[in-house]
């Protein structure tokens, strides 16, 4: 598929780029997307939740009443899970939620995400640009020129650009990443995907392996 290239003033440069059909025009595999997003979110979890079990609760181990003759259920300790302040039965324990996915499935998921965005016409190809120094106002002007002000957008760079990154860091609705940092979750969690020309070759090279 062909997409026109815009400059950072939002004007047509008169050039077009050919996006690879094997990356931007496949039939999306929803299950692969689901697994990759699930893995990404699972990896964000700290897994430090912890509840005290019966053996870990502070309290006396003295038997609180005699075994028989009270007419009520037997009870051995105030740490019994049935009592207020007692231990928790099968409570959460520290654990890792991360799990592995093979590379082919992750590539398929990213290609599916790109294809979904392309089908929705939510991909913009932008000429590579740079700022002389970090300047949020300059980045806002780029957003205005592209009609993306106050809209959720993700800018994908070919390589790290400190000035562009710092210029966008204070904007809640816009994020800047490099092609190597791009995830399925990030692609789908934005309304508009802005691909700088320098990132296209790297994306297609990485996902065509």
Curated annotation (Swiss-Prot):
Region (Disordered), start-end ranges: 45-77
Highest taxon of source: Bacteria
SUPFAM superfamilies: Ribosomal protein L4
Keywords of the record: Ribonucleoprotein, Ribosomal protein, RNA-binding, rRNA-binding
GO cellular component, one term: ribonucleoprotein complex
Stored InterPro entries: Ribosomal_uL4, Ribosomal_uL4-like, Ribosomal_uL4_dom_sf
GO molecular function: rRNA binding; structural constituent of ribosome
GO biological process, one term: translation
Entry keyword GTP-binding: no
Pfam families found in the cross-reference section: Ribosomal_L4 (PF00573)
Subunit field text: Part of the 50S ribosomal subunit.
PANTHER family recorded: 50S RIBOSOMAL PROTEIN L4, LARGE RIBOSOMAL SUBUNIT PROTEIN UL4M
Family stated for the protein in its record: Belongs to the universal ribosomal protein uL4 family.
Function: One of the primary rRNA binding proteins, this protein initially binds near the 5'-end of the 23S rRNA. It is important during the early stages of 50S assembly. It makes multiple contacts with different domains of the 23S rRNA in the assembled 50S subunit and ribosome. Forms part of the polypeptide exit tunnel.
Protein name: Large ribosomal subunit protein uL4
């Amino acid at each position: 598929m062909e997409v026109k290239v815009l400059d950072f003033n939002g004007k047509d440069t008169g050039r077009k780029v050919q996006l690879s059909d094997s990356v931007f025009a496949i039939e999306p595999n929803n299950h692969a997307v689901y697994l990759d997003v699930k893995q990404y979110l699972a990896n964000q979890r700290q897994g430090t939740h912890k509840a005290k079990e019966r053996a870990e609760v502070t309290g006396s181990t003295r038997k609180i009443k005699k075994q028989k003759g009270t007419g009520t259920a037997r009870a051995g300790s105030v740490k019994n899970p049935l009592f207020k302040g007692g231990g928790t039965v099968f409570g959460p324990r520290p654990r890792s939620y991360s799990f592995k996915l093979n590379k082919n499935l992750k590539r398929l998921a990213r290609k599916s995400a790109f294809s979904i965005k392309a089908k929705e016409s939510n991909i913009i190809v932008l000429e590579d640009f740079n700022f002389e120094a970090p300047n949020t106002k300059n980045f806002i002007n780029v957003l205005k020129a592209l009609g993306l002000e106050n809209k959720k957008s993700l800018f994908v760079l070919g390589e790290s650009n400190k000035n562009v990154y710092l210029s966008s860091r204070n904007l809640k609705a816009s994020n800047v990443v490099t092609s190597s940092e791009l995830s399925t979750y990030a692609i789908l969690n934005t309304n508009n995907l802005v691909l700088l020309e320098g990132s296209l070759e790297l994306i297609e090279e990485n996902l065509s392996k």
